Amino acid sequence: QASTDYDDEDESTVPEAR
């Protein structure tokens, strides 16, 4: 899972393309 690129339910990380 690419949590660093896309956050599933965790808004702690900022995704590049949302």
Swiss-Prot record:
Main location: secreted
Domain of life: Eukaryota
Key words of the record: Blood coagulation, Coiled coil, Disulfide bond, Hemostasis, Pyrrolidone carboxylic acid, Secreted, Sulfation
Modified residues (Sulfotyrosine): 6
Gene Ontology BP terms: blood coagulation
GO cellular component terms, A-Z: extracellular region
Keyword Secreted: yes
Protein's UniProt keywords contain Zinc-finger: no
Post-translational modification: Conversion of fibrinogen to fibrin is triggered by thrombin, which cleaves fibrinopeptides A and B from alpha and beta chains, and thus exposes the N-terminal polymerization sites responsible for the formation of the soft clot.
Coiled-coil region: none
Places the protein is found: Secreted
Record text about domains: A long coiled coil structure formed by 3 polypeptide chains connects the central nodule to the C-terminal domains (distal nodules). The long C-terminal ends of the alpha chains fold back, contributing a fourth strand to the coiled coil structure.
Protein's UniProt name: Fibrinogen beta chain
